[in-house]
C-alpha cells in the first residue's frame, strides 16, 4: 500500500480547530462513557494492473474499554458506497484472538472494475485501467464501562493494519503483505466531589443530592448511574440512550457518609452541577456550579500519535479545571471562581461544594432578584410610614 495510509479518530468538541482539514479528524479524542467514538481509515488502491485478483483486508484491534459496532461500518471507494455482504464482509470470529474484527474485500480489483469500468467492459484494455481510487473505511465504537477504572492516562488505543496481495504472479489468495499497525487514542475524565459546611474545622456533609447538566439552563441532563466499578457514579452518554428516554438505571447523585460524590467518565467540556437537595439543616444552593474541564494535547500527537504515547506527556499534556460559584446568603450576593486541583494521571478534577446554615431569602442569586428584593423593601417602608402618619391624625 502507500505512505498516505491514515487511521484517525474524530474529536467531538472544537472540531473547527482540530485536524488538517479542521473537521475534528485527528489521532486523539476525549469522550464520555457511553458515547459513540467515530473512527476511519484512509488509503488508496495501488496500481494493480498486473494482478488477476487482489486481496484487501483491514485488521482492527480495540482496547477492552471500546465496544465495536458492526452495523456502523461504511466502506467507500471513490464516491461509490460498497455493499456489505456483497463487496466486503465484516468478520468478528475465526480471527486472531488479539483482533476485534476484520473488513475483508476478497478481490479489490474486481470491485473497482464493477463500479468504475463495468460500462466499458471489453473496450478498455486491462493495462489502461486506472487504479488509485481513494478508499475510506468508517466505523464506530462505544466507550464502555471498562473505562471507569482507567480515566486519564494512558487512554484507550485502537490499532489498524492492512493486509494485501503482494505477488502479482499468484491468484490473489497466496502471498500477502502487511502495513505496520497505526494507532489512535481516546481519553475520559472524572470529577471527585466532596460536600462540606463552612465551619472550621469543616464537617463532611452526607445526603446532599445533585444532578449534572450540559447547559446553563439545566435542561439537558447528563444522566449518571451507580458505578459498576470504581467509587461513585458513571455517566450514561445520550448516545447510549434508547428513543431519547431517561434510562431506568439513571440516578440522582447523593453525597455519602464522607461527603463524597464522584462522577466518572466525563468529556473535556463545560458541565453544570445542580444541587437538588441540601443536607438537613443547611441551605440549598440555588444556582448551579459551572465546571470547566479542559484537556490539552501535544500538537505532534494530534496528527502523529505513536502507540504507547498516551502514558506520557507527549499526548495528554495538561488537565485543567475550574468551578464558578454564585451565592446569595444573609442578603449578600457573591460570585467567585476557583481553579480546581487536578491529577493528570488519573484524569481527576477535585471540587469542594460548601453548604451554609441559617435562613435564606428565596432568591436565585441573580442581580435582578437583588434589585427586586431591594425595591420591595423600599415599598414596605413607605407603606409603614404612611400608616403611622394616618394613626397620629
Feature locations, PLM:
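Solvent-exposed loop/turn and edge beta-strand elements of beta-rich ligand-binding domains
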Residues: 1-393
Amino acid at each position: 500500500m502507500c505512505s498516505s495510509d491514515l487511521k484517525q479518530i474524530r474529536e467531538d468538541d472544537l472540531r473547527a480547530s482540530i485536524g488538517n482539514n479542521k473537521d475534528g479528524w485527528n489521532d486523539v479524542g476525549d469522550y464520555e462513557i457511553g458515547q459513540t467514538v467515530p473512527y476511519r481509515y484512509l488509503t488508496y488502491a495501488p496500481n494493480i494492473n498486473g494482478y488477476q485478483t487482489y486481496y484487501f483486508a483491514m485488521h482492527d484491534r480495540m482496547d477492552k474499554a471500546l465496544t465495536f459496532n458492526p452495523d456502523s461500518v461504511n466502506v467507500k471507494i471513490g464516491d461509490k458506497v460498497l455493499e456489505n455482504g456483497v463487496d466486503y464482509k465484516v468478520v468478528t470470529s475465526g480471527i486472531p484472538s488479539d483482533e476485534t474484527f476484520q473488513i475483508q474485500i476478497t478481490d479489490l480489483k474486481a470491485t473497482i472494475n464493477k463500479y468504475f469500468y463495468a460500462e466499458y467492459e471489453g473496450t478498455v484494455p486491462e493495462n489502461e485501467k486506472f487504479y488509485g481510487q481513494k478508499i475510506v473505511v468508517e466505523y464506530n465504537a462505544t466507550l464502555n464501562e471498562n473505562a471507569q477504572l482507567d480515566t486519564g492516562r494512558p487512554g484507550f488505543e485502537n490499532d489498524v493494519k492492512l493486509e494485501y496481495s503482494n505477488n502479482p504472479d499468484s491468484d490473489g489468495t497466496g502471498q500477502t503483505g502487511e502495513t505496520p499497525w497505526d494507532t489512535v487514542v481516546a481519553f475520559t475524565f472524572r470529577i471527585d466531589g466532596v460536600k462540606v459546611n463552612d465551619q472550621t474545622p469543616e464537617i463532611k456533609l452526607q445526603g446532599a443530592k445533585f444532578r449534572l447538566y450540559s447547559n446553563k439552563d439545566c435542561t439537558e441532563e447528563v444522566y449518571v448511574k451507580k458505578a459498576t466499578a470504581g467509587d461513585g457514579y458513571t455517566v450514561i452518554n445520550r448516545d447510549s440512550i434508547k428513543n431519547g428516554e431517561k434510562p431506568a438505571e439513571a440516578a440522582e447523585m447523593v453525597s455519602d457518609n464522607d461527603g463524597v460524590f464522584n462522577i466518572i467518565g466525563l468529556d473535556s467540556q463545560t458541565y453544570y452541577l445542580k444541587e437538588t437537595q441540601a443536607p438537613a439543616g443547611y441551605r440549598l444552593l440555588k444556582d448551579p456550579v459551572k465546571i470547566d474541564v479542559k484537556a490539552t494535547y501535544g500538537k505532534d500527537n494530534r496528527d502523529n500519535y505513536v502507540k504507547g504515547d498516551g502514558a506520557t506527556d507527549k499526548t495528554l499534556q495538561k488537565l485543567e479545571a475550574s468551578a464558578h460559584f454564585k451565592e446569595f446568603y444573609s442578603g449578600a450576593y457573591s460570585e467567585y471562581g476557583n481553579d480546581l486541583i487536578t491529577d493528570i494521571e488519573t484524569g481527576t478534577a477535585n471540587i469542594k461544594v460548601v453548604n451554609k446554615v441559617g435562613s435564606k431569602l428565596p432568591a436565585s442569586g441573580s442581580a435582578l432578584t437583588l434589585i427586586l428584593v431591594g425595591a420591595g423593601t423600599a415599598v414596605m417602608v413607605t407603606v409603614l410610614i404612611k400608616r403611622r402618619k394616618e394613626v397620629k391624625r
